[in-house]
């Protein structure tokens, strides 16, 4: 139910906003926002934001801003879908205000808490674009910007989270598309110079996810050796202009706290190489059989270890139910939205296997993507246990991820004797990693998607 804002305010901040989501290509864009603290008491306050569309009519929008003080928290809101991750707050349009005509406004409000000062936000974004306060008219003959040239890492530089998006050095939302290794303890021959050359040049992959199992003959058997292998693959990805997702591949036991000490040791070592600007840290692959509270506790103990050495890198946090945001356990994103990890510059993992996870899972991701920064750090074109590729569901998933600008890594860039592998068995004994003769049905499908031109905005 809509609520009216109080007429008297204790503080007001007016900021112009541009780049509302939803207008057609080459539409005039622009809007303004008025932030009002309507009441304040010890440790709490109520605020409102009035958005007025100054440009062409829009359908669909997400407002973002940063709480200036670390002690400020969103408690609950209305007239929008609200969420907070660290200090970043987002509000997405709902059914009755999702469409804004020229000159139309939406009145939003929320209750917050604070422990120190309670300053008003000074900057707002819409879909990751910094607000400027003016209307931008389309050119009579709009120019066609050529795709940015250079490798993904060279173009985008140091990544960060802005609102619910992964953003590049130009503060623009981007989508990374790439492949995950299988367990590096089993498929080392698949990750040499020849295969990674083809991944970067022929597959045009933006990223390599390095899956380092902790158990199952993995890290716990040789911490120093596996750390060295991971660092080597990060360097090889960097040499080819790809981002590297360092995956602490926990699976069994499902509670990541079982490996807390190992995680601290491992991430302290790999984060010490903080000159690497192509690294994203994934701290727990697929928590399962464990509560979100326990996963959150683990994350809040591991992230400070990374931040002590590498303060700027993005960190991906696994979610319960095999990183399904709890959907596989009958929950949804609300448990994360209402109890987020107390850290900034983080994203939340969502994993799916297309033949098992279909419309109901896609229906869960759509609203979650307006409330949380999501990264599909692992997905398969098959079921979680079977071989056959579900092409229809896989395409539906990839179309959705493209639409929502959610980054992804496909399981797996390997010649494992399983349906989700990109290559036929024995491929990694040779030098061909691209032709139809070595690709499986899954490999051919995924390669056809990630080898298309990237959309990396630079202005």
From Swiss-Prot:
Region (Disordered): 129-151
Reactions catalysed, as given in the entry: Endohydrolysis of (1->4)-beta-D-glucosidic linkages in cellulose, lichenin and cereal beta-D-glucans
Residue span of region Linker ('hinge') (Pro-Thr box): 136-147
Residues forming coiled coils: none
Region (Catalytic): 148-357
Residue numbers annotated as active site: 286 (proton donor), 378 (nucleophile)
EC main group: hydrolase
Taxonomic path: Bacteria, Bacillati, Actinomycetota, Actinomycetes, Kitasatosporales
Entry keyword Secreted: no
UniProt protein name: Endoglucanase CelA
Organism: Streptomyces lividans
Domain of life where this protein originates: Bacteria
Gene3D superfamilies per record: 2.60.40.290, Glycosidases
Family named by the database record: Belongs to the glycosyl hydrolase 5 (cellulase A) family.
Keywords: Carbohydrate metabolism, Cellulose degradation, Disulfide bond, Glycosidase, Hydrolase, Polysaccharide degradation, Signal
InterPro entries in the cross-refs: CBD2 (IPR001919), CBM2/CBM3_carb-bd_dom_sf (IPR008965), CBM2_carb-bd_dom_sf (IPR012291), CBM2_CS (IPR018366), Glyco_hydro_5 (IPR001547), Glyco_hydro_5_CS (IPR018087), Glycoside_hydrolase_SF (IPR017853)
Transmembrane domains' residue ranges: none
E.C. number: 3.2.1.4
């Amino acid at each position: 139910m809509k609520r009216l804002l109080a007429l008297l305010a204790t503080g007001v901040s007016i900021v112009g906003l541009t780049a509302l989501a939803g207008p057609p290509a080459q539409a005039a864009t622009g809007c303004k926002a008025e932030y009002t603290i309507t009441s304040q008491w010890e440790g709490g306050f109520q605020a409102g934001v009035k958005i007025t569309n100054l440009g062409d009519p829009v359908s669909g929008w997400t407002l973002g801003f940063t709480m200036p003080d670390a002690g400020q928290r969103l408690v609950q809101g209305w007239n929008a879908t609200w969420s907070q991750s660290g200090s970043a707050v987002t509000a997405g349009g709902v059914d009755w205000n999702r469409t804004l005509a020229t000159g139309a406004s939406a009145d939003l409000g929320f209750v917050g808490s604070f422990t120190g000062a309670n300053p008003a936000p000074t900057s707002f974004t819409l879909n990751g674009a910094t607000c400027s306060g003016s209307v931008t008219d389309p050119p009579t003959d709009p120019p066609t910007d050529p795709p940015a040239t250079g490798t993904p890492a060279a173009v985008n530089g140091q990544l960060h989270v802005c609102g619910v998006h992964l953003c590049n050095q130009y503060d623009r939302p981007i989508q990374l598309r790439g492949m995950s290794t299988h367990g590096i303890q089993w498929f080392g021959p698949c990750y040499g110079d020849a295969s990674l050359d083809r991944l970067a040049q022929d597959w045009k992959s933006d990223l390599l996810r390095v899956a380092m199992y902790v158990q199952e003959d993995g890290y716990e058997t040789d911490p120093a050796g596996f750390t060295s292998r991971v660092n080597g693959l990060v360097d090889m990805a960097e040499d080819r202009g790809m981002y590297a997702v360092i995956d602490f591949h926990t699976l069994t036991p499902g509670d990541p706290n079982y490996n807390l000490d190992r995680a601290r040791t491992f991430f302290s070592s790999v984060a010490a190489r903080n000159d690497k600007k192509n690294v994203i840290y994934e701290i727990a692959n697929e928590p399962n059989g464990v509560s979100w509270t326990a996963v959150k506790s683990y994350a809040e103990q591991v992230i400070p270890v990374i931040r002590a050495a590498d303060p700027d890198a993005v960190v991906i946090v696994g979610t319960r139910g095999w990183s399904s945001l709890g959907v596989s356990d009958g929950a949804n994103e609300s448990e994360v939205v209402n109890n987020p990890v107390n850290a900034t510059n983080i994203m939340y993992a969502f994993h799916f296997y297309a033949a098992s996870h279909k419309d109901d899972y896609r229906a869960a991701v759509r609203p979650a993507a307006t409330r949380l920064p999501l990264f599909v750090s692992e997905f398969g074109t098959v079921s979680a246990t079977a071989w056959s590729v579900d092409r229809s569901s896989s395409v539906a998933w990839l179309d959705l991820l493209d639409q929502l600008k959610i980054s992804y890594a496909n399981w797996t860039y390997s010649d494992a004797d399983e349906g989700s592998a990109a290559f036929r068995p024995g491929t990694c004994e040779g030098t061909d990693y691209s032709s139809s003769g070595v690709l499986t049905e899954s490999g051919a499908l995924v390669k056809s998607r990630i080898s298309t031109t990237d959309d990396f905005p630079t202005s």
